[in-house]
Every structure is written in C-alpha cells, then in structure tokens.
Amino acid sequence: MTNSFRIERDSMGELQVPADALWGAQTQRAVQNFPISGIPLPRAFIGALALVKQAAARANTRLELLDAAVAQAIDGAAADVAAGRHDEHFPIDIFQTGSGTSTNMNANEVIASLATRRLGRPVHPNDHVNMGQSSNDSIPTAIHVSAALTVKRELVPALEHLRDVLRAKEREVGNVVKTGRTHLMDAMPVTLGQELSGWRTQIEHGIERLISVEPRLHALPQGGTAVGTGINAHPEFGARFAQELSDLTGLAFRPGRNFFEGLSSQDTAVELSGQLKVIAVSLMKIANDLRWMNSGPLAGLGEIALPALQPGSSIMPGKVNPVIPEATTMVAAKVIGNDATITIGGQSGNFQLNVMLPVIAYSLLESIRLLANVSRALADNAIAGFKVNQERIAEALDRNPILVTALNPVIGYEKGAAIAKKAYAQGKPIREVAEQMTDLPREELARLLDPAELVRGGLKGSGSGGG
C-alpha cells in the first residue's frame, strides 16, 4: 500500500483510506479497531465468501432483482477474488466483531470497487453486492463452504494418500513377526503388517467420519438474512443461491432445514472439528508408535529406522531425531486445542446469532490445512521409507517370555506363569525353559511356540487351564 490516502465516507462520517486500497470506509474502521493478532482470515475463507457473493449475484439476477449488467460485473469481480487475485486487500484481523460483519463488508467493498471498474458506473457494496444477504447468514455460509471445499479438495485426498502408503508398507513388511506390546510391556507376537493395518484402519475410519459430516456441512443458512426470518430476501433466494453455488463448486449445497438453527448455532462446525480431533488423535498414536519403534538406535527398541532427514542436535554429533513424527504430534496438539476453541465458540450462540464466527472459521480451516499437510509429510517422509531391523526384532522375540501364553490351553495358567518367571529371571528363551519344566516333546513345543503361527490367533493346543 502507498503512503497517500483518499477520503471515504460511511454512515459514521469520513476517514482516510490508503489510496490504492480496494476497500472502503467500513473495512478501514475495522483495520483501525482490531490491531490484535496481525492474522487475517485464511485464503480459503475469503475465497468461499467471494463465491457466496458470486452465487448471490447470479441468484438475484435470475429472480429479476438485480440489473444484469451490475450482476455480471459483480460476478467477474467476485470470481477474481475467489481465485486469490486480491488477497492483500483483505487485512482484517480474525479477532473482530463476532458476527464477522467487518469481513463481510470487506468483501462487499472490494468486490464493489472491482465491479465498478468493470462496469464503468457505481456498484454499491450494500445495495448490490450484499443484496438479499446479511453478515449473519453470509459468514456462517462461508464457514460451511470453505470447510466443505478444503475437506474435499485437500484433507480427504491427503488422508487417502496416507492410507495408500500405509497399505503398501503393510504389504512390504507383512511377514515380519515382532513382539507385541501392551502397557509398553512385552506381549504376544504380531506381524508388523498387522500393526500397520491398525494404523491404516484408523485413517480409513477418519475418512469415513469426514464423509459422514457432509450432509450437514452442505446445508446452508443463506437466505435467513438478519435473524433467520429471511427479511429483505426473496422467498426463493435461498434455494436459487444454493443451486448457483453448487454449479460454481461442484458440491451439492442446499438450503438448511432451519435458518434459525443455521444462524444461531455452529453445531456443524463443532461436529466437524470433533472429527478432525479424532484424526489428530489417530495421527498422534501412529506418530508415537513410530517414535518408540525407532528409539535407540542402541539403547531403545530399535525395531525400525526412520529416514534420516536432518542432523538432530547442535551439540551431539551424529544424532538423528524422528522429526516428522514429532511434527505430527505437535500438529495433533494444535488441532486438539483448536477443537477446544471451536467448542467454546459454538457455545456462544446468544439467541438468534453466534458471535464467535471468525475464530471458529480460522480454527476450523487451520486444523484442516495442518492435518492435510502433515498427513502427506508423515506418509512420504516417515512411513514410506522406514527400514526394518530384522535382527533386533528376532532377538527380542526369541527372548519374549510372554510366548508361554500359547501353552495355557495345554499346561494351564499357573504352570505357564512359573515358566515365564523363570525364563525372565534367567534370561533364557521360553522354549528352553518350557522343555525343562514340562513333559512336552521338543517338536510339540516348537509347534506351539512358533511366533509365525501365533500371529494367526486361535487355540494352539488343548488340555487343562486357559483364560
């Protein structure tokens, strides 16, 4: 922006606006009123709000309420904003009026300025760009639209990529038998493929959960205007608008079942955030498992070696840390924190309007973006390239006293516990101690205690005891 100014006027009077700014007086007042975080609403939200203005102009024209030439100018201007060509003209802080009115007027003023240039005569931000709308329905609508688009275009594809990488790795290491662990203590064996199948299924469930929210995310409050009654909007505006927006985006938007609910609550945003939190928790679990399996390399589990991406210490030469899993856990923590913010925001629907819309929008879109980006990083820079330390895995498995569990149906729990205790105390393989303490033939013990068979589950013998 230049250091020169022009004078703009609104209902409160005159004030200076940067000469080359596309916004007008109301945006400038918001810039001056909210020098709080320096963080504007994200590009995805501004793009969605521009699509709202574009669809509204088309709907109002079809309803014969808006001059066709004015509508065409607004349509083109809004399309430019939606494409990100004027992002620098949306400076308002996320911590602003709770309805997001400042940002709605920012969009109205910028689009009106651009449309005026296109048309060659004045296009009014309120009378034309905001026709049939209120901030109270446009901002909640933009939350739904921006979230629906970013989930569909960014997060779901990223999670599908992570799922596919996990599936490929699952096949690659599917026959590696390792010590299972419960409570971080040795347990019965599993294959590495079985372990990864659990991770993959977590991600698949995450995708399914996101898809399950879509019907409510696609239901829009646009048409409710100020308090849900639809004052100053054509009775058919909501339906026309939803159809135009569907045509613009390729998503099946529709008017919400109840505009009063759509304006006064943010239950769908809270629901979506909850599903994002579940995905964050899943990624946290996967990342922590990777960190444990990679720990060492000498004094830890050392079952796998993650790709060495960068030096890990400014003081300890040769140290390499699990940086991608660590980044993943931090993203998870942030998303969980954002969910708390969105939950509190959702509680702030007083009578006919929620008044924490901007922070809900910001937090929701940040969570979506972070999860999408870190899912790809985790897939490509950690899971796809890790190597298996077969020797370390086999050594630990051979000395795992919990393998005696497979003998329970044959010798009983008490006898098995005694064998496990002695094997652990003497540091001997369970098969060797079982041979000493039972009358089972060596061949039978080898069959019953074969880790490759134990991972198949089921009963391996019959006799006294069990449970």
List each language-model region with its residue ranges.
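Conserved, well-structured ligand/cofactor-binding cores
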Residues: 1-467
